[in-house]
Amino acid sequence: MFRRTLNRLCAGEEKRVGTRTVFVGNHPISGTEPYIAQRFCDNRIVSSKYTLWNFLPKNLFEQFRRIANFYFLIIFLVQVTVDTPTSPVTSGLPLFFVITVTAIKQGYEDWLRHRADNEVNKSAVYIIENAKRVRKESEKIKVGDVVEVQANETFPCDLILLSSCTTDGTCYVTTASLDGESNCKTHYAVRDTIALCTAESIDNLRATIECEQPQPDLYRFVGRISIYSNSIEAVARSLGPENLLLKGATLKNTKKIYGVAVYTGMETKMALNYQGKSQKCSAVEKSINAFLIVYLFILLTKAAVCTTLKYVWQSSPYNDEPWYNQKTQKERETFQVLKMFTDFLSFMVLFNFIIPVSMYVTVEMQKFLGSFFISWDKDFFDEEINEGALVNTSDLNEELGQVDYVFTDKTGTLTENSMEFIECCIDGHKYKGTTQEVDGLSQTDGPLAYFDKADKNREALFLRALCLCHTVEMKTNDDVDGPVEGAGFTYISSSPDEIALVKGAKRFGFTFLGNQNGYIRVENQRKEIEEYELLHTLNFDSVRRRMSVIVRTQKGDILLFCKGADSSIFPRVHSHQIELTKDHVERNAMDGYRTLCVAFKEIPPDDFERINAQLVEAKMALQDREEKLEKVFDEIETNMNLIGATAVEDKLQDQAAETIEALHAAGLKVWVLTGDKMETAKSTCYACRLFQTNTELLELTTKTIEESERKEDRLHELLIEYRKKLLHEFPKSTRSLKKAWTEHQEYGLIIDGSTLSLILNSSQDCSSNNYKSIFLQICMKCTAVLCCRMAPLQKAQIVRMVKNLKGSPITLSIGDGANDVSMILESHVGIGIKGKEGRQAARNSDYSVPKFKHLKKLLLVHGHLYYVRIAHLVQYFFYKNLCFILPQFLYQFFCGFSQQPLYDAAYLTMYNICFTSLPILAYSLLEQHINIDTLTADPRLYMKITGNAMLQLGPFLHWTFLAAFEGTVFFFGTYFLFQTSSLEDNGKIYGNWTFGTIVFTVLVFTVTLKLALDTRFWTWINHFVIWGSLAFYVFFSFFWGGIIWPFLKQQRMYFVFAQMLCSVSTWLAIILLIFISLFPEILLIVVKNVRRRSARRNLSCRRASDSLSARPSVRPLLLRTFSDESNIL
């Protein structure tokens, strides 16, 4: 125990430097040198938050950081230390209940984490020690240990692959538990250790690994291994993410591997990813905090008023010191200011229940339990991936009903990301794969169907480029889980585009046969096998927007093949070759196809020696490796020869257009942020109806700006011109703007990445902010915006700009790829698509769904219902507590401001915990104030709740005045009834506690029946909790007043409730007061039902007369209480 603690404490020492050195097998390099074991953390995984010793203090500290909990703690301490009118139990017991329930919930969740940690930490692993396999517990693995992992086992820590049972030193891994990707990934051993396949040979290895310090990026690793043999100098090889096996990943289709541990325990990438995303706060939470401040002010005002009036009332000697209650000498000598302060605190305690202590717990339970409805929704289930929706955080359920802006990726989100090779052009000549029917069978018309033929050698060169320049892997069907291509093998790649291009080349006679021992094998049109030595791969990245390979032919020629976006390739090829291809690229983009340009160049041997040295040096760098590689790549990929371009079709997702239309009808602004070229993205936007045929497009692109020599001057002119046009067309208010979308000319904006950079980073003094301001004004007036050629960080920049607009609009981002993660994390709500580009977006999102079409129901139905439910819950909590405390306040005017409580301590304690908590919880989980089909069919209903409509000042005042009216009725109704002696048969008048019990009975029944009136969607659960709560109150009152409790000093409630109900007059009084309290609500229901029926009849007559289809009119929800939609009346 002490050693583990010491290890964890000392583990930070090695973080002082930028890299760490690992001795493979924990062997010294030279037998003559002493070996000192390094201090790294052990392999224990600790995902739990608490221990047995720190649970109580740590949990209490976290809970009392909440304003309401801390407030009630202060009230409790005041009750304990000051002579207050109520027992400390009245505030202490509810607080204890809330704290205990939360602690039990969090403790149970942490216990589950402890149990899961122990299962991992105690699992058996095999370590190579002294040329033998030694069985150990996983937590005992140390950095430098060589670990043996067998098929279908999970890697116990982050390992560098040394060797595998395959001859080429590869292994296949699935990382579903890390990033959700179920497809196999290939990892590679260093070529110098491939042959070390036995425990003896592994134990004889002397090597060191230098690598970066632990960091959470799953897809980044920088290191190098130095292997020492009989020679004096070590052989150094670079290490990258393809050599690293991550903890939590599973070995597949490989019998056995050996790897050396480089990161263990809490320093593994999986453990570093445990940390949660930045906390997002919903609009409802902000409203709750604002309401708490308002009610705290009301509480302070009540206490101040009562304290002041008490001393005004006591200014009369008879009132201050009556003959039957003379003050003691000590009371007379007490400092007056201290007495006033003590009285103020006493009134604070008396009225403290105006702040709902249990609301936070109820809100948490509502969010947690409510999130299951999304996961259980069968409409979100996708048979293709056999998965449904997933909720990664339940804190933002209601935020789904408040979205103003939707930012969506294009590829894989609006489109299927299922690529098909359509056509290509070679040296400006168009080639298209055509088919013809022969005896009912479809077959390709020759290897290449062409419209104008290029040189035969150029055709072959182009197709060879498609077969060589990619990261596709060929696997036999036995090595692959899932669907196969046929013919005994399948293609696997992280990019569907590359698979489509390789398949396209295969269709036209050139077949990629895989990569064996560093040689790429290609079968040409003559069925001959060609082999190319793969010298270097210059991987694709979103900044360069291209990738390259350097290969050596069988004749010894060294060639570079490069493919990428036209904007990336054209500046790097000879200018006279561009025009031949550019027209085809633009035409294909207009047709909605994804285009890539292909280029090559021959590298002289002398140049290659220099290039090779630069690449090796950059790959071996441990610091700034990416920047150094990028610099070398930039130098290599110049002066190329353009061969041609490809066109790949990415079909629109099912119901993508309908979803866009529904979001538009709901008043949401949809922006498409994509890295594709403008023409392709523009075509997709028309196809998915983001742009309508009558939409006037405003362009801020490189093409429109380059018409002038001074780009910034031209940009300024366009911005001013567009702003004038839009301000003249549309009114200023946002609300009228949404109506104007259907009444006036619609405008759409197109902007590309370079123009956005010019707007944000203008060289003119102070013009950048001015450009940004004008640009945002234009965007706000457009119904749709297309941002093309966007880098990932630019996507996040745009989301951040909109978030910071005046009014703080709620933003939602949806995407499927790693390049969408930045905008998903930046927006208020992040949605990940479980797509074909991995699961990085889904893993970093708040919610994940299989398809873009599911966004419609997620927002229009679930978002709408969640918001209405929790908004009603919040308003109801403050309403019922104001109803509860107002009679207590009014009672002080009739008891000389003596701080006499109106209710018994048991009622004060149980009101929020037992009598009124379950009905509102059931309502907030199950209520459907509008039918789900109606919400789906009429997206305009969504507009009625946006802008946090139900928690604005209007609804807040409505609920507050309603509570004030009902609280006044409770008190004065009972007060005036007490003026007569007819309540008892013997003429006796009820006392103080009977008076308070009648008020409390009317209160409990009224606030519960108010919720029953508000309920439209009745289930057996609603019936059970509503009528059950009322029955429990009656039962408890009989039980509490029917027994003499020995632990109570005073038996003031003994037989009060039973005697009270023996009077028929009391029964009638209670029923009458409940009816008077609810009468305005009932009257509102009747009036609005009549108006609704009248509106329906008029609508039916209008439909019959003019035969026009129209959606039902929608009543504003700003002041709704939902009682008008009750099924009771």
UniProtKB/Swiss-Prot annotation:
Domain of life: Eukaryota
Tissue expression remark: Widely expressed. Expressed in retina, brain, liver and testes (at protein level). Expressed in lung, bone marrow, lymph nodes, prostate, ovary and uterus. Expressed in fetus.
Record carries keyword Transport: yes
Record topological domains on the Extracellular side: 105-287, 365-876, 927-952, 1010-1023, 1088-1129
Post-translational modification comment from the UniProt entry: Proteolytically cleaved by CASP3, CASP6 and CASP7. Phosphorylated at Ser-1113 likely by PRKCA; this creates a functional di-leucine motif that is sufficient for endocytosis.
Membrane topology: Multi-pass membrane protein
Motif (Di-leucine motif): 1113-1118
Names of required cofactors: Mg(2+)
Site, Cleavage: residue positions: 439-440, 445-446, 481-482
CDD domains: P-type_ATPase_APLT_Dnf-like (cd02073)
Positions of modified residues (Phosphoserine): 442, 1105, 1113, 1123
MF annotations from Gene Ontology: ATP binding; ATP hydrolysis activity; magnesium ion binding; phosphatidylserine floppase activity
Enzyme class: translocase
Function comment: Catalytic component of a P4-ATPase flippase complex which catalyzes the hydrolysis of ATP coupled to the transport of aminophospholipids, phosphatidylserines (PS) and phosphatidylethanolamines (PE), from the outer to the inner leaflet of the plasma membrane. Major PS-flippase in immune cell subsets. In erythrocyte plasma membrane, it is required to maintain PS in the inner leaflet preventing its exposure on the surface.
Disease linkage: Mice defective in Atp11c show defective B lymphopoiesis, specifically in mature bone marrow, pronounced stomatocytosis associated with anemia, hyperbilirubinemia linked to mild cholestasis and hepatocellular carcinoma.
Classification via PANTHER family: PHOSPHOLIPID-TRANSPORTING ATPASE IG, PROBABLE PHOSPHOLIPID-TRANSPORTING ATPASE
Similarity section: Belongs to the cation transport ATPase (P-type) (TC 3.A.3) family. Type IV subfamily.
Subunit-structure text: Component of a P4-ATPase flippase complex which consists of a catalytic alpha subunit ATP11C and an accessory beta subunit TMEM30A.
Protein name: Phospholipid-transporting ATPase 11C
Annotated source species: Mus musculus
Gene: Atp11c
